[in-house]
Structures are given as structure tokens and as C-alpha cells.
Amino acid sequence: LNTILNPDENIKTYFKDADKLFDSSSIAHSDRWTIELPMELEIIKYLEYTLSKIILQIEREKPLTNNECYFYRLSLAHEYMHLEAFIMTARNLGFSIFNCHKKILNTDFFKSKKVIIKEKKLNKRNLNLEFLFDNETIQLNLNTKPYEIDTSPVSVESFIRFYENNGYSNKLLWSKEGWNWLLRNKNNTFINLCTYDKNRKFILNKWFGLDHLVDSNFPALHISFFEAQAYCNWKKRRLPTELEWMLATKKKEFEWGYVWEWTNDTFMSYKEFRPHPYEDYSKPWFNDHQVVKGTSFATQKKFKSIRFRNFYQKHRNDVFVGFRTVKDLL
């Protein structure tokens, strides 16, 4: 934020070596667990100090236009992302935070159906948005053909059926990369997370530290791209493209927003791409990640948008991510 303030108005750095502690652009993921961070109380003081200074700056500047509000909105969007990352971390470490997982556990899910999509055109509304990320300026290919798509993400019951039909032992269903991933991660798949008893009661094991009974229509989550792809091959279907997913949201039957959803699209650069001031947000991850759409139960409500382009590497199953399937009609 200091980059948009006058030199004599810059917010003073609270920690002398803050970048060495918190700069995600320069700290490798593998090193983040070993950094000697300040004590919790000191972190809280740091947050309160920074927030108070930013609020004063907003009151002084009184930003009104989209350009004037850009860095404030970027900071808020980034905070929304990290709030969800905190919840993901809590799940991994086995404790509850904000009780936000109760929302999805208490939701009644319905059996998924199929809906046919014939629309080809998507309104180009991105230029009118108050805020957008640099990767959201892409103009998607509009040459879609009619297709059939699930109205809901694949359920735990459907995915367990895939497992029962030798889905995890049939090498022909998996890509070469996916099969190698499976061999290395046999104890870290959806089948290790979700089990069932003789009465076919489905259980999420040690989810936020506790075992939870879930309905058969509960969305399968913590699914890697490789598992989703193998399931689609088993069903003789495929994952939707990003555009197909977005077009389907126009249908009232289309349910989304409880789990992120894998798409068939690689997160790529494009001819008109220009990085925004937060240069490391998109550019370093092109060609190495998969586009993920929607939101999860842990996402802040104000962050929900069909335009948002999330992205993860294919092996990631620590995320609250599931998928749905598509069938070509022509």
C-alpha cells in the first residue's frame, strides 16, 4: 500500500524485517513452517496497527473511482484469500476455526441431475467490474458446442462407487502423471478421508479434528485433479472447461458455492495479458496450474463471483475442492 502514498505519509514498518517473515513471493512453501515468527500477541498488535493506519488513510484520501480504490480492494481481496487459507490450515492440523465447516455440514444436498446447455455466448462484463485480477481480463473462446453437465458436484456416494468399481486399481482410467501421483499418495486420497460403515453411512474422518457423518449427496471434496480425471474416464465423461462452467451458472438448477471445482483448462497466459501491480499473483503460475472455479464454504461471501479464476496444481487435495462432469452432445 505504501506504493500509492506520498513519501511523507508512508505507513511506518511495524516489524524491521517484515518481508523476511511474511513475503510469500520470496519465501518457499517448504520453508514457511520453519520461520521463527513473532508471538501471537505481537502479531495481533501488528494487525491492529496496520488496520488503523489504513483506515486513517482511507478517511484522508476519500477514494471514489475504481482506480483510486484499486489497492484497497486488492488488499481486501488478498485478505479474503488468506482467511480461507487459515481455515484450510486448521483442517490440516485437526482443529476447528470460526466453526465455518458447520455451514456445509448442516446443508441439505439434493441428488445431482443433468442439464443441457446450448448457449454459446457469455456476456463480456469484466470491463464493468469495480475490481478484477489481471488474469480475469481474458476473453474466453465462445465456440462451444451443446453439452450436458451435472447440476451439482459429484457426491461422496458417487465417488465411493467409483472406488468400489476398482477405480483406484484400474491403471487405464488414469493419466500417466495421475497414476504416478497415486502410487506416491496411496494413503492420502479421498478414500482415506471418507469411509463408510455396513449401513453405508458416510464418514469424514478427522475433518477439522473430528469424525462427521455426512449425507450420501454431500459433495466429494479434497479431491485431486488426477482423481477427478480418473472418475470422469470411468463415467465416460469429462471435466468442464472454464467457459462451460460459467455458461452453466445461468441455469437455475445449477448449484455451486460449497466446494471449489476443477476444470479441464490449464491456467495459461494469453496474448493481451498484462500483469497488474501485484505481478506475482498470476504470471509465475501460468502453464503449471489448473483453473478452478466457484467458491467453497470457507470463502468470504463478498468474494463469490463466476468470473473469479482460482488455480491450483493438479496434486493439491488439501483444498476444499471437488468437481462435476460434462458430456458432449455433438
Language model features by range: what are they?
Residues 13-29, 118, 173-210, 283-295:
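Core domains of carbohydrate- and sulfate-ester-processing enzymes
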Residues 103-117, 123-124:
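Extracytoplasmic and endomembrane cell-envelope/extracellular-matrix remodeling and assembly machinery
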Residues 1-30, 60-108, 147, 153-156, ...:
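Short, contiguous alpha-helical
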Residues 137, 164-186, 255-330:
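Surface-exposed recognition segments
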Residues 38, 126-144, 304-314:
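Short, polar loop/linker segments at the starts of domains and inter-domain junctions
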Residues 106, 112-113, 139, 220, ...:
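Short Gly/Pro-enriched turn/cap motifs at secondary-structure boundaries
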Residues 38-51, 136-166, 193-252:
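Short aromatic-cysteine micro-motif
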Residues 27-40, 64, 213:
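Acidic/His metal-coordination segments adjacent to aromatic residues that form catalytic metal sites
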